[in-house]
């Protein structure tokens, strides 16, 4: 830490001083980072107590004892914007000292439960269904109002969909036409509302409910299907840690790390449920930190997709991420040599694909793969005639002629990945990934007891994860240094 200029990260501290003298921010930063290196995750109360009773913390704080509120303000207000830069500079200092190889990056992800109520879900599809039901109710109400206004020539326009601003204009026009004043409305038992008051209040209630649905859909966004009411950034996901034992969804964040020589080189926090969507943001963050892409990004089958393989090709990275059926392709000889798999169909001299019965497959059409950002297409082929085929029970599952979907580019990529990972170098990388990347999460969760997110909001969670990552790297550096001293 002595070789790093820490003052450049402490710019958010106000220049004016009121009350007692300010604690030294450099001492506070060192104390906070040491606390996360010492404990894995350190609460503010524990940090305050350690500054009173633990000699190491007392020395770092120069015998001062800030309160937990002071530490909380310092972390949330001063470190929030600069935590990634601190992470970068500390990593560069450690990597230069330890000669860390950043060309090999071992990637893994885990889902940590968020600090949110487990039953405070908001589902995007349910909200959309409720909104469309509300559209029908609004149309029915406007038809009633138009029937009431038929004598006047005034008409409320009906549509298939509505927005709150449009309803607000119609509500104001209705109140203006009848000179309605909410102060004159009656409520309570024994008071009878007029038909105009009923229409006004129903339209107003629909407007507020429509605004609520729009707010929920805006919070949810286009990239996820749920969120928690008590932490809008948390998404409901399936976790390995299931309290009720019924495979329920829990609010969580997807934490991604890239490990190099047992140090966390890059970390990221996402609300994606799948690891496939997290690969590109993690690589872009790595490039932002170090100015280049890793030559060998090694990951499990959760990351191997057409999009990610194309991304690796475009940025000069080798394909060392497994795909979904990698283990079955590598270990299951019966599956690999199954004659009824389309990959094993022979191609005759005319370039026509033929099944084990010798029937030709003819090209039908090309189909875009839904949700693929690179415009991936599949070619659909259909067998000329499957009637009376002796292999029909093993080859197909429907009474129709068999159809197969083929993406030759993706198939070629899978062959390249198989060759890479089944080589001696690939086997060593796979072994190292399971040791380093998964081992890092094992140390964080089991040894250092960091199993659940404490803060709320994506920015605060990202701050927390970077503090934990810095602490892990300092912890690893300390262990390696002590082992070298003992060996000497």
Language model: regions and residue ranges:
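Anion-binding and metal-coordination hotspots
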Residues: 21, 32, 40-53, 64-488
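Basic, short loop/linker segments at the boundary and entry of helix-turn-helix/winged-helix-like folds
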Residues: 1-30, 36, 408
């Amino acid at each position: 830490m002595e070789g790093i200029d820490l003052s450049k990260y402490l710019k958010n501290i106000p220049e004016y001083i009121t009350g007692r003298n300010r604690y030294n921010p450099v001492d506070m930063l060192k104390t906070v980072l040491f606390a996360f290196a010492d404990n894995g995750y350190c609460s503010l109360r524990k940090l305050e107590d350690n500054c009173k009773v633990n000699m190491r913390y007392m020395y770092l704080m120069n015998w001062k004892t800030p309160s937990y509120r002071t530490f909380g303000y310092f972390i949330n207000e001063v470190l929030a914007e600069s935590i990634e830069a601190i992470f970068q500079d500390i990593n560069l200092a450690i990597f230069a000292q330890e000669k860390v190889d950043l060309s090999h990056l071992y990637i893994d992800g885990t889902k940590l439960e968020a600090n949110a109520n487990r039953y405070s879900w908001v589902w995007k599809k349910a909200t959309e269904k409720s909104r469309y039901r509300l559209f029908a109710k609004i149309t029915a109400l406007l038809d009633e109002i138009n029937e009431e206004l038929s004598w006047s020539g005034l008409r409320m326009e009906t549509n298939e969909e509505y927005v709150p601003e449009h309803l607000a204009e119609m509500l104001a026009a209705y109140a203006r036409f009848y000179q309605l004043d909410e102060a004159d409305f009656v409520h309570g038992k024994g008071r009878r509302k007029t038909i105009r008051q009923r229409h006004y209040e129903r339209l107003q209630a629909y407007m507020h409910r429509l605004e609520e649905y729009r707010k929920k859909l805006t919070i949810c966004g286009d990239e996820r299907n749920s969120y928690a009411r008590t932490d809008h950034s948390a998404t409901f996901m399936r976790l390995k840690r299931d309290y009720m034992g019924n495979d329920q969804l829990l609010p969580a964040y997807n934490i991604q790390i890239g490990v190099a020589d047992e140090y966390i080189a890059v970390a990221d926090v996402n609300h994606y449920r799948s690891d496939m969507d997290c690969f590109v943001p993690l690589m872009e963050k790595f490039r932002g930190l170090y100015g280049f892409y890793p030559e060998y990004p090694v990951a499990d089958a959760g990351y191997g997709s057409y999009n990610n393989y194309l991304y690796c090709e475009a940025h000069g990275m080798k394909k060392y991420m497994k795909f979904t059926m990698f283990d079955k392709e590598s270990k299951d000889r019966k599956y690999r040599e199954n004659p009824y798999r389309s990959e094993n169909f022979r191609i005759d001299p005319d370039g026509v694909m033929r099944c084990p019965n010798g029937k030709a497959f003819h090209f039908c059409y090309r189909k875009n793969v839904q949700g693929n950002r690179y415009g991936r297409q599949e070619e659909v082929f259909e067998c000329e005639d499957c009637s009376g085929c002796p292999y029909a029970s093993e080859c197909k599952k429907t009474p129709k002629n068999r159809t197969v979907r083929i993406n030759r580019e993706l198939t070629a990529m899978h062959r390249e990945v198989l060759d890479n990972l089944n080589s001696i170098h690939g086997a060593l990388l796979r072994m190292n990934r399971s040791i380093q990347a998964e081992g890092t999460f094992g140390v964080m969760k089991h040894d250092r007891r960091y199993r659940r997110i404490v803060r709320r909001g994506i920015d605060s969670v990202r701050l927390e994860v970077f503090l934990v990552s810095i602490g892990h790297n300092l912890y690893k550096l300390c262990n390696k240094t002590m082992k070298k001293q003992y060996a000497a």
